[in-house]
A protein has these predicted regions:
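Auxiliary Fe-S-binding modules of radical SAM enzymes
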Residues: 1-77, 81, 112-119, 146-157, ...
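Short cysteine clusters
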Residues: 64, 85, 89-92
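Short functional micro-motifs and their immediate structural scaffolds
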Residues: 69-72, 90, 94-97
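Core AdoMet radical
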Residues: 93-113, 118-172, 177-213, 225, ...
């Protein structure tokens, strides 16, 4: 297995991230980032059904601001391989793993349950993501691939999008997921290279680029996608450089959204990026060859994923 910052299953532990909040004045939330919560009944019903099947969504675990909107229209991003992550990224509120917990084991029925839930919801576009499982020799890639196959069997006419971890740079694991037949392969860069040690301390910028490059070379007909957050202290030129790096891997789709601090334990927001800047990022991305760029304050990598993939696919028809 390629070098990984978490060496063995016995060596990982809960990663506690602490920040000196006294030295950081959090900016006030601007009007364009105020979103009301509605459709409580629909949201509650979907949560009950997910719990009944023992399933998780990144929408809930990552405290996505779009959860009410997406759940109300019957859309959700399934998060597999459990609900505990072996990494401690500064931006993420997904629960972190500690060794020896029984709930850290894999549920062999999870792939089938995801397929059943997606079928019951009548999803035309199914998004599957996962926590990092650096404790597993294959990074969870066999389980990931099996989930894709089960969804494919249950919904043969639907699009399947995967949002994968870096698998510690193990390209065999990446190939395993791609061989299961997703339509869209997504791996998020998350932030600019300078901020990696602070935002993604157990990931590597070049390694994530290699994952994207390999995916497109291995399965050229699969749409490749990557997302990043802004508002963590990056500069415009750094965002442009990241977009160029990602596009050089022949990535088709880019998503750009505002980072919002999910809990007090996470990184503080450095600044709130105005909508006009998101528009400029979109225009820049399109100018360097992306098929589609979805850029806006509330954009997340799987937000309106069906519409974004349709936009990217239409490029071939023009």
């Amino acid at each position: 297995m390629p070098e990984c910052s978490l060496a063995t299953a016995d060596s990982f532990s809960l990663v506690q991230i602490n920040f000196n909040r006294d030295s950081i004045a959090a900016p006030r939330l601007p009007e364009w980032l105020r979103k009301g919560k509605t459709h409580f009944e629909a949201v509650h019903s979907l949560k009950i059904e997910l719990r009944r099947k023992g399933l998780h969504t990144v929408c809930e675990s990552a405290r996505c601001p779009n959860i009410h909107e997406c759940f109300s229209r019957g859309s959700a991003t399934f998060m597999i391989l459990g609900n505990l992550c072996t990494r401690g990224c500064g931006f993420c509120s997904v629960p972190k793993a500690s060794p020896g917990k029984s709930q850290f084991s894999l549920d062999p029925d999870e792939p089938q349950h995801v397929a059943e839930m997606a079928s019951e919801m009548g999803l035309r576009h199914v998004v599957i993501t996962s926590v990092n499982r650096d404790d597993l020799a294959d990074g969870g890639s066999h389980h990931f691939a099996e989930t894709v196959r089960k969804v494919r069997a249950a919904l043969p006419q639907s699009k399947v999008e995967v949002l994968t971890p870096d698998f510690c740079g193990d390209l065999t694991a990446v190939a395993r997921v791609l061989d299961a037949g997703p339509d869209i392969f997504n791996h998020n860069m998350e932030t600019v290279e300078r901020l990696y040690r602070r935002v993604r301390p157990q990931a590597k910028y070049p390694q994530s680029l290699r994952v994207l490059e390999f995916a497109k070379k291995y399965k050229p007909r699969v749409l490749a996608k990557s997302g990043l957050m802004v508002g963590l202290g990056e500069t415009v030129e750094e965002v442009h450089r990241l977009l160029r790096d990602v596009r050089c891997c022949n990535t088709d789709i880019a998503t750009i959204g505002q980072y919002l601090q999910p809990t007090r334990r996470n990184l503080p927001v450095a600044d709130f990026v105005p909508p006009a800047t998101f528009d400029a990022y979109r225009d820049y991305g399109l100018s360097i060859g992306f098929r589609a760029v979805f850029s806006g304050p509330f954009v997340r990598s799987s937000y309106f994923a069906d519409k974004v993939s349709e936009q990217a696919s239409r490029v071939d028809d023009q």
